[in-house]
Amino acid sequence: MAEACEPTRPSEDEDEEREPLLPRVAWAQPRRVAPGSAVRMQADEGADVLREPATDEPPAVSGEGSISASLSTELDRTRTTSSETNTFLEDPEFADIVLKAEQAIEIGVFPERISQGSSGSYFVKDSKRNIIGVFKPKSEEPYGQLNPKWTKYVHKVCCPCCFGRGCLLPNQGYLSEAGAYLVDVKLNLGIVPKTKVVWLVSETFNYSAIDRAKSRGKKYALEKVPKVGRKFHRIGLPPKVGSFQLFVKDYKEAEYWLRRFEAEPLPENIRKQFQSQFEKLVILDYIIRNTDRGNDNWLVKYDEMKYAKKIESEESNWIDNKQLLIKIAAIDNGLAFPFKHPDEWRAYPFHWAWLPQAKVPFSEETRNLILPYISDMNFVQDLCEDLYELFKTDKGFDRAAFENQMSVMRGQILNLTQALRDGKSPMQLAQMPCVIVECSKSGSQGRVVHLGSSFTQTVHCRKPFFSSW
């Protein structure tokens, strides 16, 4: 259905799907030499250029020098722009994983579409067909033009007044996924699997009929009329930008374990570990204002058989993450970072607020971990700047909309700070009035926020039609 709608697709999406393709084999060696952070990935034309060493030019195709006319015509035709290069200078381990995924695609081990969910997301595999990550292309997000699932299309046709989430920027889910991981790292929470922005191309992705026809036509021209085919800038399908999250093994949906824990209560030390992990999930969701956190999209890892003897015989130090016997993984963070609080049809509540764990006040350990960060305005400013560096890589980046997103996030941080100081519980935190903290710059016009900036606090009084509280 998405292919049929392609001719009327917005021009911005059309441009995005028609960028040059990555060199397929020869890029492997340069990547190992200079892998870098996805947050520092170079911006597209028209966006601010990120200041990153050794990434101002497209990477060399071979280890001996840059691309030249003497190289093969195949490399010339697949030469890429720097905006589509998967470089991760600060994380060689992640770079190797992405490289394995690309090499697997080269030999025909394609990403597999995930049947669950309302968007086009894919299990990415290595050459041994082991799942190593989850890729969510921007163009196949829930409200994207190339979403292969019918759920949102039916929603749009049958109930257009409620279609979409009016508080979220459209087609920014991949940045939200990467932004959630950034917040997780900054706060030292350790519950979001590593997630960064990458470019991938695969036949199993959902492309428009036009893109597939052009790809077939170019291949046919190259085969029948090589002189003409060699003039094409790219042979093959265009790469897609999206979020790449490392796959976590041996985890199950929280819904399964929550039911088990009701019937079979946890030992006290394990219960404390779970409570600590749960509080970190609450903090993450609240700061980024996750609008899609149900008990089916966060995971729990707990092998009671494996750890039974250890649980009974030891009083484990549950603060030490290395000895954690139960862990939480916060996945599906693509519907977060709203530019305003939900105030239209639905409230998008935090479903964890109704769990028994949400009635327990935040522990002293959690307060000691989080308060030093979020009560420091320098830390909050630094967090906003890091998110700015990430979000501005999108072609449709809008500075005013980003400032609104940060105003909501600062308001969430303000509420969280007060709740931790007052010893409130997660449920009480979720019931606090919504606040917006806007920044009005004075003097110099910097990137995001300055120490000399003044802030205006506003209570958001408008309630959605279907309110949860």
From Swiss-Prot:
Region of interest called Activation loop, as start-end residue ranges on this chain: 330-350
Location(s), subcellular: Cytoplasm, Cytosol; Golgi apparatus membrane; Endoplasmic reticulum membrane; Cell membrane
Annotated GO CC locations: cytosol; early endosome membrane; endoplasmic reticulum membrane; Golgi membrane; plasma membrane
Similarity comment: family membership: Belongs to the PI3/PI4-kinase family. Type II PI4K subfamily.
Keyword Acyltransferase: no
Region (Important for substrate binding), start-end ranges: 141-143
Binding site for ATP: S121, K136, Q245, L246, F247, V248, R259, R260, D332
Function noted in UniProt: Together with PI4K2A and the type III PI4Ks (PIK4CA and PIK4CB) it contributes to the overall PI4-kinase activity of the cell. This contribution may be especially significant in plasma membrane, endosomal and Golgi compartments. The phosphorylation of phosphatidylinositol (PI) to PI4P is the first committed step in the generation of phosphatidylinositol 4,5-bisphosphate (PIP2), a precursor of the second messenger inositol 1,4,5-trisphosphate (InsP3). Contributes to the production of InsP3 in stimulated cells and is likely to be involved in the regulation of vesicular trafficking.
Organism: Mus musculus (Mouse)
Top EC class, one word: transferase
GO MF entries: 1-phosphatidylinositol 4-kinase activity; ATP binding
Pfam families named among the record's database cross-references: PI3_PI4_kinase
Region span, Important for interaction with membranes: 149-162, 252-260, 345-354
GO biological process: phosphatidylinositol phosphate biosynthetic process
Gene that produces this protein: Pi4k2b
Region named Catalytic loop: 289-297
Location, primary (coarse class): cytoplasm
Domain spans labelled PI3K/PI4K catalytic: 108-439
Modified sites of kind Phosphoserine: S37
Keyword presence, Cell membrane: yes
Catalytic activity: a 1,2-diacyl-sn-glycero-3-phospho-(1D-myo-inositol) + ATP = a 1,2-diacyl-sn-glycero-3-phospho-(1D-myo-inositol 4-phosphate) + ADP + H(+)
Membrane topology: Peripheral membrane protein
The protein, known as: Phosphatidylinositol 4-kinase type 2-beta
